[in-house]
Design a protein with these regions (language model features):
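Conserved ABC transporter NBD signature motif
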Residues: 58-73
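Conserved ABC ATPase "signature" region
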Residues: 97, 101, 107-122
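Catalytic Walker B motif of ABC-type/P-loop ATPase nucleotide-binding domains
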Residues: 151-155
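A short, surface-exposed alpha-helical micro-motif characterized by mixed small hydrophobic
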Residues: 192-194
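ABC ATPase "signature
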Residues: 210-211
Length: 235
């Protein structure tokens, strides 16, 4: 069974088609990169997947069901779509404790996820003083609170320096080795080539290619394959 499925997904905002006939599946226990030019429909597709936007037609499934039908969704799926969704006046630890309390997750889990993302030393600092990279780590910690089976990450490397990007690569590989399924969108093609197992390339809201990283790039690079498959796009 695929961990995540998009079936003929379409989404219109007024007369604008953000996504059209997107069909793709994501295998369990792998890191899959969702790639496409600006405006290709990546973020809208993820929002439909997470029940934050209603599809015009088609459907999405996580672990075989629509997001709204998941039982205890925080233990099934964690998501990072925006690293700015924290209370700036609270510390990193306090923000996570609020999230944990709302989901009836033990406080002890907060310290566990802070350690996982290497944010223990900044845990008692107010979130408004966090760098963008630190906010990304805090967002990852929040997504991991429920120890979910599936992670959805939209541009998780934003704001990370080269050391942070290398850390993120190893971190995601470790999570996948533990059996978690990870769907990640990113513009950092060179980094994605060294991180993901599979790739979905979309353009104009449609799937242009899907397969293993080796199948997609052949003897070339991910950037070369991406540019070939999205030729003619307006950015």
């Amino acid at each position: 069974m695929a961990a995540i499925e998009f079936s003929e997904l379409a989404k219109k905002y007024g007369k604008v088609r953000s996504v059209r006939r997107l069909t793709a599946s994501i295998a369990e226990g792998k890191i899959t990169g969702l790639l496409g030019p600006n405006g290709a429909g990546k973020s809208t597709s993820l929002r439909c997947l997470l029940g934050l936007a209603k599809p015009t037609s088609g459907s999405t499934k996580i672990l075989g069901v629509a997001y709204k039908d998941l039982k205890n969704p925080l233990s099934q799926i964690g998501a990072v779509l925006d690293s700015r969704g924290f209370h700036g006046g609270l510390t990193g630890r306090q923000n996570l404790k609020v999230m944990a309390a709302a989901a009836k997750i033990p406080d002890s889990r907060v310290d566990e996820v802070l350690e996982l993302v290497d944010l223990e030393q900044a845990a008692n600092k107010r979130a408004k003083g966090y760098s963008l990279g630190m906010k990304q780590r805090l967002s990852l910690a929040g997504a991991l609170l429920g120890n979910p089976k599936v992670l959805i990450l939209d541009e998780p490397a934003n704001g990370l320096d080269p050391i942070g990007i290398a850390w993120l690569r190893g971190f995601l590989r470790q999570l996948a080795a533990e059996g978690k399924t990870i769907l990640v969108s990113s513009h950092q093609l060179a980094e994605m080539q060294h991180t993901v197992d599979d790739v979905i390339i979309i353009n104009h809201g449609m799937t242009m290619a899907q397969g293993s990283i080796k199948e997609i790039i052949g003897d070339g690079t991910l950037e070369e394959a991406f540019l070939r498959l999205t030729a003619g796009s307006t950015r």
